[in-house]
Amino acid sequence: MDLVTFLVLTLSSLILLSLWRQRSRRGRLPPGPTPFPIIGNFLQIDVKNFNQSLTNFSKTYGPVFTLYLGSRPIVVLHGYEAVKEALIDHGEEFSGRENIPMSEKINNGLGITFSNGNSWKETRRFTLMTLRNLGMGKRNIEDRVREEAQCLVEELRKTKGSPCDPTFILSCAPCNVICSIIFQDRFDYKDKDFLMLMKKLNENVKILSSPWLQVCNNFPLLIDYCPGSHHKVLKNFKYIRSYLLEKVKEHQESLDVTNPRDFIDYFLIKQKQANHIEQAEYSLENLVCTINNLFAAGTETTSTTLRYALLLLMKYPDVTAKVQEEIDHVVGRHRSPCMQDRSRMPYTDAMIHEVQRFINLVPNNLPHAVTCDIKFRNYIIPKGTTVVTSLTSVLHDSKEFPNPEMFDPGHFLDANGNFKKSDYFMTFSAGKRVCAGEGLARMELFLILTTILQNFKLKSLVHPKDIDMIPFVNGLITLPPHYQLCFIPL
């Protein structure tokens, strides 16, 4: 048999296998566009506007439909009712995490973000309990965030009102808050170890959320056999792992089991107490992966939201004026803002919620997976099937948020100007997989933004109407365009 004949037969077999697998599944799964062999629905999706593609498909096939990315079926949930029904009403069944090949290479099924089963449940339980023990929701962690906000203000003063790109400095503050929780100590913004750690973490988040990595995850052979940025992720994680293990070693040498100082201490104490069944959950490898997950989730997302918030506040100076008026009235100039102030600052609270709703940071959430065969709206979704929840369709629902494409803090205010909660506010996801650091992120956004606005006037380099708001969608995360501004001391 010559090479050409062999290749033709191999390709034909792959196409037939792909067709058979797709047809055998389609009778059970929700409807959707007809996929092509091997590549699935890739040609029917606008990769530059994936969210619009999902909206268009939902108009044809309804709020629950199936797409094929390669030969792999993806069930898409579009709209508040479908998302709520899955993540909240059937929370346990939809609490799985998709097996993402690149994440599997890094985490080996460990950590809190991409793990499943008992390992995920135990790690998440420990993480939430430890954050509470360290003062989440209390003055302890709040004081750390307030201290970091003041350090940020001092760094901004050093710009002396000159134009600057806020990207780096706004990344330092949330990263340092995580450092203080994990390692006990914060770092100077010029500390070499801190800068290198932040560089590696930020590079990995950007690469992992890039379109190329989404392609690699759908065609896993590319990871091992093709050059590309994914190799840098593995190299960066090797550095992060080595750095974290060195920190763990320092903690092991100075550990006082009666007086835990930080997240690592609590983990090491629990490790000593763990029985033989719990040993895997309390291994050093799981600690490293969990810390890496906390940094990735708690640094880039918060710093990007802060960066987007400043851009929106320059675009809408009337909103900024109302927020600063509220800060002057409630906080004044002689003390720093605290969390007790938030209940008396409804407009500021509404503005922060509207920033998160409007920017739609993670448009389609991290992919879920069903943990068992489930009948959902008369369809059968087999165990292990990937489920994508369109948070865009929830956060930009015109029934809940009139004119959803407009930035308007009034979306979260009632007729009397009081803050108004919304069940549609799912920026941190919902259900069993809701972000473990939601409370910390909310605290950081309020304290850092109010502290900046208490101390500075935000000056754009262009007229507000000329400020570019077109987001850069980097696969997983929506990023604001690059910009500069001046922080003018008040």
From Swiss-Prot:
Its EC number is 1.14.14.1. It catalyses: an organic molecule + reduced [NADPH--hemoprotein reductase] + O2 = an alcohol + oxidized [NADPH--hemoprotein reductase] + H2O + H(+); (5Z,8Z,11Z,14Z)-eicosatetraenoate + reduced [NADPH--hemoprotein reductase] + O2 = 11,12-epoxy-(5Z,8Z,14Z)-eicosatrienoate + oxidized [NADPH--hemoprotein reductase] + H2O + H(+). Its main location: endoplasmic reticulum. One of its GO terms (cellular component) is endoplasmic reticulum membrane. Liver, brain, kidney, and intestine, with trace amounts in lung and heart. Keywords: Endoplasmic reticulum, Heme, Iron, Lipid metabolism, Membrane, Metal-binding, Microsome, Monooxygenase, Oxidoreductase, Signal. GO terms for molecular function: arachidonate 11,12-epoxygenase activity; arachidonate 14,15-epoxygenase activity; heme binding; iron ion binding; oxidoreductase activity, acting on paired donors, with incorporation or reduction of molecular oxygen, reduced flavin or flavoprotein as one donor, and incorporation of one atom of oxygen. Pathway: Lipid metabolism; arachidonate metabolism. It is a peripheral membrane protein. Heme binds at residue 435. One of its GO terms (biological process) is arachidonate metabolic process. Its cofactor is heme. InterPro entries: Cyt_P450, Cyt_P450_CS, Cyt_P450_E_grp-I, Cyt_P450_sf, Cytochrome_P450_fam2. It is found in: Endoplasmic reticulum membrane; Microsome membrane. Residues 1-20 form the signal peptide. It holds the Pfam family p450. The keyword Flavoprotein does not apply. PANTHER family: CYTOCHROME P450 2C29-RELATED, CYTOCHROME P450 508A4-RELATED. Belongs to the cytochrome P450 family. A cytochrome P450 monooxygenase that primarily catalyzes the epoxidation of 11,12 double bond of (5Z,8Z,11Z,14Z)-eicosatetraenoic acid (arachidonate) forming 11,12-epoxyeicosatrienoic acid (11,12-EET) regioisomer. Mechanistically, uses molecular oxygen inserting one oxygen atom into a substrate, and reducing the second into a water molecule, with two electrons provided by NADPH via cytochrome P450 reductase (CPR; NADPH--hemoprotein reductase). This is Cytochrome P450 2C38. It comes from Mus musculus.
